[in-house]
Every structure is written in C-alpha cells, then in structure tokens.
Amino acid sequence: MNGFPMAILLVMPVLLAASASALPDKVSTTAIPDLSGVRAVAISGDASSINITTRSDQPYGASLSGRRKGWFSSWYSSWYFADCRDNSNMRVDGTVLHIDIAASSWLDPSDCVIEVNANVPAGAALRIDQSAFTARLDGHFSDLAIAGKAADVTFDGHASGIDIRADAVRASLDFDRVEADERVSIRARALDAYLGFGDSVPIDYRVTAKASWVDARQPSVPGAMPRVEIDGDFVRVRIR
C-alpha cells in the first residue's frame, strides 16, 4: 500500500505532460480580408514578429495572431484557453492600416508571440515603432521607417527611403533593383548590417562610429545614389 501513493506521484507528471503535449498551443487570429485600398501600414506597441509582402498575385489582406511558446505554454494550454492577444487590435483608417500590439498580462506564465502577416499593394509606406521586433519585408515599398530598442530586419525588394533608429539592430537590406533615388539612414548603438545593391553600382556611403568594421567592394562615390549614412557606437557592415 505504501508504494501506491509513490506510484501515483511518479505517473502523474508523465500523464500531465502527455495530455499537455496532445493539445496545441492556443492560437487566436484576427483578419482583415481586403486591403486593396491601403497605401500605408503603421505598426506600434509591444514586441511582435512581422511578415509583410507586396505580391500582386495574392489577395491583399492582413492577419494578427497570437501563439503561446516557451516551456510553460503546453501546461497553460492544458489548463486554460485564454486568448494571449486580447489587447491587440488592427483597423483601417482611410488608406492606412493601423496595427497596435499589446502584450498579455505580466501574470501570464507563458511566452506569447504576436505574429503580424500582411500582403499590401506595392508602393505602400511602412512604419514600425515597437520596443522589439523581427520583421521580414518582401516587396516594393515607397518608404520604410523603423524605430525601437531592438530590431531584426530582413528586407528584399525596393524602397526609395529606409530610415532605421534603434539601440540594437541586425539588418539585411537587399535591393532587387536600383533606381538611383535610394536613401538609407541607420542609427544604432550596436549594428550588424548587410546592404546589397548589386554589382558595379556606385554608392555614396558614410559610416561614423566609435568602433567599426566596414567591408565594401568599392570605395564611396560622393554624390552618387544610392546614398547610405550610418551612425553608431559599434558597427559591423557589409556593402555590396
């Protein structure tokens, strides 16, 4: 009889773990189906994972979803089914898509990842102002304005203007074409960046930093476009 309670104690954690793993992390989604009239996107608030495209062969729309991750997430999903995205919202005001990210309560024992996915018409302007985020931007935009404390940005496409302001930045900016009107400005305390414009493209670039490592295939050409200005404390940048 004495061994029975001990067996219960040994088996219960296994059963709880199995039941937890059998249930998926809680996912909640809000969607706006038609963004054909949108000309700008403004994302603000708390941290999120962002994916924005400008594909004409797919419907224009946006979704905002929350997913619980981290080692507490499976246990939380077993006991509760609360929405981790309760305070975030998304709306269209005229031609602007506004997305405001609000984190779940600090009492929430799990890690809630807010995911933003949108496909908007080419030529739209994009502004991101968040404390921390990762962003995958694939397409043709008019301008990109990014501000925050920590930013991880991957860009593949074209934008006439890119402005990034953050304490810590990791950026990969790969232009698929050059129209000789591009301006890139990055200010960060710590920066690790790659900028690709293509082979044999004259670039006017300036890097100002306390400590820097700059790898460029060709010297700066004053007055040329694209124009790149980088200011920071600790900078590592490759320019191609």
Describe the predicted segments one by one.
Residues A135, V153, A171-L173, A193:
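Fold-core signature of tandem repeat domains
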Residues A7-A17:
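Bacterial N-terminal signal peptides
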Residues A18-D129, D138, A145, D156, ...:
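Acidic (Asp/Glu) and glycine-rich low-complexity loops/linkers
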